């Protein structure tokens, strides 16, 4: 006797709180584009009707990091631009994710010199790397789907100021209960 037989036509679904929260996070992401080169053009092509990235929860690009939870770094990052990238990342609220789009963002690309950062993972933690020079919009969509799978495995407590919330903290009064 399965759950469907017990519940009848009531439409009962059993899940976990983390499952619901992570499902919501994958369906309503607020990306901020940090486009610096030709990869940004492919990113814009991905927003066109041919690819319609809004199907994957990427409806609107945000200009402010305070309204974004996903940073897409598309293109090469110079050493002078690195502090700006870090400052924008630090201004994003938790939970936040980073996608390195293209070979320049992932590993410096063909620019192996003193002025170009050899991968943005030297500056910010990267969740998904999208390969290509420049990567096609299909590759970016695949990277977003990989990020969705990573988000679905997340724990809610992993995103509290970057540290898990412990029961002891709540008992000591470090965390105030709601209500």
Swiss-Prot record:
SUPFAM superfamilies (UniProt xref): HydA/Nqo6-like
Cofactor: how bound: Binds 1 [4Fe-4S] cluster.
Keyword Cell membrane tagged: yes
Protein residues bound to [4Fe-4S] cluster: 38-39, 104, 133
Cofactor names: [4Fe-4S] cluster
Protein family per UniProt: Belongs to the complex I 20 kDa subunit family.
Function noted in UniProt: NDH-1 shuttles electrons from NADH, via FMN and iron-sulfur (Fe-S) centers, to quinones in the respiratory chain. The immediate electron acceptor for the enzyme in this species is believed to be ubiquinone. Couples the redox reaction to proton translocation (for every two electrons transferred, four hydrogen ions are translocated across the cytoplasmic membrane), and thus conserves the redox energy in a proton gradient.
Subunit structure: NDH-1 is composed of 14 different subunits. Subunits NuoB, C, D, E, F, and G constitute the peripheral sector of the complex.
Protein name: NADH-quinone oxidoreductase subunit B 1
Underlying gene: nuoB1
């Amino acid at each position: 006797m399965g759950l469907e037989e017990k519940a009848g036509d009531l439409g009962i679904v059993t899940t976990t709180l983390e499952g619901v929260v992570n499902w919501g996070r994958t369906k309503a992401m607020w990306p901020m584009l940090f486009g610096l080169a030709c990869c940004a053009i492919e990113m814009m092509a991905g927003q066109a009707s041919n690819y319609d990235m809004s199907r994957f929860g990427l409806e609107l690009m945000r200009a402010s990091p305070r309204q974004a939870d996903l940073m897409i770094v598309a293109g090469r990052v110079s050493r002078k631009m690195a502090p700006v990238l870090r400052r924008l990342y630090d201004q994003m609220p938790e939970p936040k994710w980073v996608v390195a789009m293209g070979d320049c963002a992932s590993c410096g690309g063909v620019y192996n010199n003193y002025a170009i950062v050899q991968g943005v993972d030297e500056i910010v933690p990267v969740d998904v790397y999208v390969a290509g020079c420049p990567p096609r919009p299909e590759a970016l969509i695949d990277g977003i789907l990989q990020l969705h799978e990573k988000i679905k495995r997340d724990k809610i407590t992993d995103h509290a100021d970057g540290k898990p919330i412990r029961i002891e903290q709540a008992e000591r009064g470090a965390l105030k209960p709601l209500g």
